């Protein structure tokens, strides 16, 4: 199972704070979350391809975490692209405990985001809490933005 270890992992990274106070709506795709918050729409990774069925340009941001990198395909990202407002951002936290694999997986996400039509693709260092080892692990976070005008 690439992209996740056998142990439980959770992320301390949260959805944008502007969504929790009612100013916008955020989408969170997470395999470890089963709660409801006002202003946040949760999806399981298995439902990621259905994001294209949601109202177009509804969400301000999307936060993806605890998802296998192989599930973050261009077709799934295209659905997310259509449901985001212009200049909406997507943040993908790579929860891979094997540090050597993180740059490879980040490049794979970057390529898939570019194929889906996103711009301003950036990778930066981040941390996540690995419940299996009970410690903070260093990882990478890939962010990208929906352009104001479609690329194609």
Predicted regions and their residues:
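Intrinsically disordered, Lys/Arg-rich low-complexity segments
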Residues: 2-15
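A short glycine-rich, Lys/Arg-flanked "PGG" loop and its adjoining helix->strand segment in the class I
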Residues: 73-89
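Conserved S-adenosyl-L-methionine
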Residues: 118-130
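Class I SAM-dependent methyltransferase SAM/SAH-binding core
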Residues: 13-53
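Hydrophobic adenine-recognition pocket in adenosine-nucleotide-binding enzymes
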Residues: 67
């Amino acid at each position: 199972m690439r992209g996740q270890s056998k142990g439980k992992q959770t992320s301390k990274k949260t959805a944008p704070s502007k969504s929790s106070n009612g100013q916008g709506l955020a989408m969170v795709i997470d395999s470890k979350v089963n709660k409801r918050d006002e202003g946040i729409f949760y999806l399981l990774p298995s439902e990621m391809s259905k994001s294209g069925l949601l109202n177009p340009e509804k969400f301000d941001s999307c936060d993806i975490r605890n998802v296998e990198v192989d599930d973050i395909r261009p077709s799934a990202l295209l659905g997310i692209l259509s449901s985001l407002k212009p200049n909406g951002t997507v943040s993908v936290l790579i929860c891979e405990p094997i540090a050597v694999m993180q740059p490879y997986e980040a490049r794979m996400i970057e390529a898939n985001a570019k194929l889906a039509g996103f711009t301003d693709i950036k990778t930066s260092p981040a941390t996540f809490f690995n419940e299996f080892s009970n410690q903070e692990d260093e990882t990478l976070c890939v962010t990208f933005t929906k352009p104001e005008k479609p690329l194609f």
